[in-house]
Amino acid sequence: MINIHFSNNLCKQFHRGIKGHDIVNDLFPKLKNETIAAKVNGELYDLSREIIENCTFEVITINSEEGLEIIRHDTAHIMAQAVKEMFPDVQITIGPTIKDGFYYDFATNHNFSSDDLEIIEKKMIEIINKNESFIREVWSREEAIKFFSSIGEDYKVKIISNIPSNENITVYKQGSFTDLCRGPHAPSTKTSRAFKLTKVSGSYWQGNSNNERLQRIYGTAWRNEEELKLYLNNLIEAEKRDHRKIGRELELFHIQNEACGQIFWHTKGWTIYRIIENYIRKKLENNGYIEVKTPILLNKELWEKSGHWDKFRENMFLSEAEDKTLAIKPMNCPCHIQIFNSKIRSYRDLPIRMAEFGTCHRYEASGALHGLMRVRGFTQDDAHIFCTESQITSEALKFCNLLIEIYKDFGFTDILVKFSDRPKNRAGSDEIWDKAEAALKKSVEVANLSYVLNPGDGAFYGPKLEFTLKDAIGREWQCGTLQMDFVLPERLGAYYIGSDGKKHHPVMLHRAILGTFERFIGILIEHHSGKFPMWLAPIQLSILTISEDSINYANSLKIKAEEHNIRVELDTTNEKINYKIRNHIHKKVPVFWIVGKKEVEENSVSIRYLESNKQHVMPIDKALKTLLTCASI
């Protein structure tokens, strides 16, 4: 007999070898139809897997995140089976779950098309309707290699050769299909009814462009048709909001092959960039930050001292000059320590909040580049806070409050925080880790932010907070970070003179709010669908003339608005007014002033807003006052 413990403090004895579905039927009959797997001693188990030792037991239902991931894993296997049955010469490689879905990579000379996806989906439905059981088997290494070699699955043989010799090799079967897999899986294929294959793309074996080229089929799977429909509708909405499409339409930026992964900012896009930069600069000044500027090109010796050379060498752009190896900086932190080290610091000088709009470059594979979201050249709203251990809590709280304030101004109020605490292998004493972790917890709690814990996921040099924004269509974007660092200041010789007259290494807080300007602007474009808040809009006001008689008056209005720092576009073209209105709606300008003979005579304007088809007349002084109110944050 074995003892099995449950979350409700119940402990019950069962025969050794009992299976999860028997326990569910016995103790949780109401959850029978919703249960998809179990967690035994913290490890996910198939419901058909035998339990052979004392353990804890937790039911995993389809309504949980873990349950949903299992559904997606099941669907990936079903897709692989369908592809293999339809295209027998295909070799299957890997098929993991990802956010919102799954993919599988295939080695084949056949070029998959959207028409193929429809046919594959039909075959998948056939497999699902057969209600095939997922069967787990444990094989020896020799058995696994022999089997997959015999059916021509060379990539599976390669994977097996990299599995540590002390690990079990598990396979799963459903119907005629067998795949190498750790599991777990649902009892059968019937839970994978709500799915859609979404796209085909190229990939490489093991993600290395020097290896064989593969084809990747992506899909999504959900608990039911309602969730699937909502997700697919959001995909359509996301396509409409694509920052690359809107960026072209609004003439904000472009990218070209001659500067791969770098941005050509057009006037309107650069206007947004400068507005954000000036806004952040003012916020930093008001919160006690000093602004610095550090070199872009540095000798590799500094990167060797900091430890970045070993970890980031492959992502650095290098140059040779005067028999020295120089690296374009991929981050700013070592440079900020050089400024800290430029003179003797006292404990009375701390905290020092050192900010830089730091331009950095990192080599990203060309296939990973994506508009503004993934680039090679970028600018961070970077800052490093040098403080004492006793100042960690107050500095972390000040940062959280500043971050919330800034996100709110940009239209983000739904913020998720991930807290990563100490890993097993770490630098620094337990005492300083205790202080740092307590400080981060307190800062998010006092700031009234909810957080989830990522146990053991902190860096070896300190715990961290990651701040994720939820946009208008529910997508999550990780932007802000607050990372403690107990190591780099010591490694680069940073110290201050304490009240005891001795040298002490400061604690360094790496922090960012936007992340990078490029990516954050991309997020803003998609969040607002190009309809920026008025304070952020590159053109805030369009003045449209109805006839030639109103051109001089319109010019005077433009001058008056510009005197109040309003960004104005004047349209005096010889087009009908309805055409002009449609044109400026397409440009997503938030406010229109329409002027004709009547407005000239009355010293007024007809006001129309982007989100309304109504117009109303207002005296110019009142209209300007209203405009200035709308244009303020």
UniProtKB/Swiss-Prot annotation:
It holds the Pfam family tRNA-synt_2b. Binds 1 zinc ion per subunit. GO terms for cellular component: cytoplasm. Transmembrane segments: none annotated. Its EC number is 6.1.1.3. Homodimer. Residues 242-533 are annotated as: Catalytic. Keywords: Aminoacyl-tRNA synthetase, ATP-binding, Cytoplasm, Ligase, Metal-binding, Nucleotide-binding, Protein biosynthesis, RNA-binding, tRNA-binding, Zinc. It is found in: Cytoplasm. Zn(2+) binds at C333, H384, H510. Its cofactor is Zn(2+). Residues 1-61 form the TGS domain. Belongs to the class-II aminoacyl-tRNA synthetase family. This is Threonine--tRNA ligase. It catalyses: tRNA(Thr) + L-threonine + ATP = L-threonyl-tRNA(Thr) + AMP + diphosphate + H(+). GO terms for molecular function: ATP binding; metal ion binding; threonine-tRNA ligase activity; tRNA binding. It is an enzyme of class 6 (ligase). The lineage of its organism: Bacteria, Pseudomonadati, Pseudomonadota, Alphaproteobacteria, Rickettsiales. Catalyzes the attachment of threonine to tRNA(Thr) in a two-step reaction: L-threonine is first activated by ATP to form Thr-AMP and then transferred to the acceptor end of tRNA(Thr). Also edits incorrectly charged L-seryl-tRNA(Thr). Its main location: cytoplasm. It comes from Ehrlichia chaffeensis (strain ATCC CRL-10679 / Arkansas). GO terms for biological process: threonyl-tRNA aminoacylation.
